[in-house]
């Protein structure tokens, strides 16, 4: 992918791979660029609303909710392993169904097929990889907002990609103006989501006129 081209060309062999903490950030950053582009390309409020709705459902829901539930499943599995228990497919299915049921309550009916979703992607369970999706999305949101609000935003994002693994996640995030030693990037992300919802509501009102 693109970030590895930048880092390969800018770093030594030993520093080309960026931290797992934010390795998914470039892909979700591109998703934000796409939804922004579509919103501003369309003239019809319905199409604009469509673009922003997919930002919420495809980018944020998938990375903040779906992977959160997979991480919760993973944590329970690890706890059982540390307790000396042996796990088979049936046990893993029951754990996943339990996690989904506790999260959704009576709002969503969880069937036996949903319990199989833990086996979708094996790399989700490589070194707590599930957590990188939400962490990376906070980073990509910070980069996107920096791009929109700073004349140097594009340059800084490219420098972020070029940094590869030469810096710590804390240092790399600072290239795009994000201090992840605080909760501000997360709070900014939450505010951005709120603003997106408000804009969707405005487009809906336009359609009702």
Where are these regions (language model features)?
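C-terminal, non-catalytic "cap/extension" segments appended to globular domains
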Residues: 3-5, 29, 40, 67, ...
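Short, glycine/acidic-rich hinge or "gate" loops at secondary-structure transitions
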Residues: 10-16, 39-52, 150-157
């Amino acid at each position: 992918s693109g970030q590895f081209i930048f880092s390969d060309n800018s770093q030594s062999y030993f520093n080309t791979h960026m931290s797992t903490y934010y390795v998914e950030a470039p892909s979700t950053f591109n998703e934000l660029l796409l939804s922004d582009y579509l919103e501003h390309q369309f003239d019809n409020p319905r199409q604009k609303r469509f673009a922003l709705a997919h930002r919420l459902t495809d980018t944020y829901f998938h990375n903040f909710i779906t992977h959160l539930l997979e991480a919760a499943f993973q944590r329970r599995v690890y706890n059982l392993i540390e307790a000396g228990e042996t796990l088979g497919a049936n046990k893993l299915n029951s754990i996943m169904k339990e996690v989904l049921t506790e999260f959704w309550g009576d709002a969503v009916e969880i069937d036996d097929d949903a319990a199989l979703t833990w086996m979708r992607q094996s790399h989700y369970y490589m070194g707590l990889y599930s957590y990188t999706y939400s962490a990376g999305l906070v980073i990509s949101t910070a980069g996107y907002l920096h791009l929109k609000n700073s004349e140097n935003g594009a340059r800084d994002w490219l420098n972020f990609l070029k940094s590869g693994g030469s810096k710590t996640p804390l240092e790399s995030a600072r290239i795009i103006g994000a201090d992840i030693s605080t909760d501000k990037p997360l709070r900014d992300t939450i505010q951005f989501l709120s603003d997106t919802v408000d804009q969707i509501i405005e487009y809906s009102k336009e359609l009702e006129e």
